[in-house]
Amino acid sequence: MIRNGKRRLALTALAGASALALTLTGCAGGGDTPSGDAPAGFDAEGAKGQDITFWVMGGDTPDEAREYLVDQYKQATGGTLKIQQQDWTDALTKLTNQLPDEKNTPDVTEIGNTWSPTFTTAGAFSDLSPIYEDLGGDKLLHSFVEVGEVDGKQYALPYYFGSRYVTYRKDIWQAAGLEVPTTLEEFNADVAKLKTPGQSGFYIGGQDWRNGVSWVFANGGELAKKDGDKWVSTLSDAKTITGLEQFQTLFEDASNAPATEDDSTPWVNINNDKDGAAPSAATIIAPGWAHWSIGDYVGDDDKGKEKREWNDEIFGVFPLPGTTAGEPAPVFAGGSNIAISAKSTKQAGAKELLRIIFSDDYQKLLAKNGLGPANTDFVGDLGDDQFAKALVDSALNSKLTPAAPGWAAVEGQKILEEFFGKIAEGGDVKALAKEYDAKIDAIING
């Protein structure tokens, strides 16, 4: 996150940002601001006085952004916006149970981009096609728009994008005589050299498929593909197997994390403890916004939460390298979509909130805080520092999970956590792939 003002990307990062915009979007489209007359398709009159609820997932939406939304919604409608934070761990269950319930549904909800196909095909969200152009149209992240579409109509739009990149301890790497690797093969070998009984060369949990899948993607593998009009799991594909075997070796040779640990908080492991004790990890991979939790301990805030200050002498970042020197590996494209519940009785107020969220000012606010904006016109507002460059460079080649109608069920049943965990425990990769292909095939098409 870049909290110290609006800065433009340096030439190298700007070139990456432009490429990212071209990769993820088409061109042209609309845009609006919270002030002024509501565009066609909105009902500003009907929104007056409506109190609405907005679910955000986890803590990624910063307090500054939440306060902005509450204030702007009050100004625009006179109504109250209640923002409720949901934990990612049980969000899927809550969405499944409450979206169909008119009395308990959120009016607007953030939703993981990988869950969007399931809920859109199930009819859980309102049709946003009439206001799509007003909210940004083709300037919005194309891959995120696609996962929220059904029959050419938009039901869930991008909220923000993130990407995962490597954070490393410069002091530990330099002491070992290691430089930033240029290929995935070099990375795997280097982090293995850094492992000790008390320190992971690369801290990654065995069940952490969202990061582990980068080794699959880097070797040309996929989790699933569409065959005709059906989706099929491709864990047994030769290229996928190559990536899974690399992950298995990496986990054994470089990580001390439990085989049962999933997508967690590895930044805790790369930091020194409060008392200065050595870190338990020399290298991690995490979403870009995690760097605000990495650094030297500088005390606690008024809520008792640790404050960390980045130290360039100790910490550094780089995109996970790919199999070809100089090219980043494809990583899992983090981020969220946003949608209006079809069961909400306050559609006008919900649309007004979306108008504020997709306004120029809010898109800039997201970028300032290190969250990739939904509207690619504002990618440059991410800044020009090392974090912005690593975010853009890693996002250039990032990939989403399959846009299959049953994908939310795959994630909800934690099939991939179980699969990757068994691989981390040393299981037969090919046999496990065949077993879990069958499990995924049974539910992936909804």
Cite the ranges covered by each PLM segment.
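Hinge/lid segment of periplasmic solute-binding proteins
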Residues: G41-G46, N113-R164, W215, D312-F318
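Conserved N-terminal structural module of periplasmic/extracytoplasmic solute-binding proteins
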Residues: I2-P117, E309, T324, L365, ...
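Extracytoplasmic ligand-binding clamshell segments of periplasmic binding protein
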Residues: L223-D300, A348, L432
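Extracytoplasmic/periplasmic solute-binding protein
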Residues: Y155-Y159, R164, N188-T240
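C-terminal lobe and pocket-closing loops
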Residues: A290-N311, T323-E418
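A structural signal for short loop-to-beta-strand junctions that line the ligand-binding cleft
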Residues: N97-Q98, T105-D107, G136-D171, G201, ...
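Conserved C-terminal helix/tail region of periplasmic/extracytoplasmic solute-binding proteins
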Residues: T80, Q174, L396-G446
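Short, solvent-exposed loop/beta-turn-alpha elements that line the ligand-binding surface or hinge
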Residues: D43-A47, S129-L140, E222-T242, T249, ...
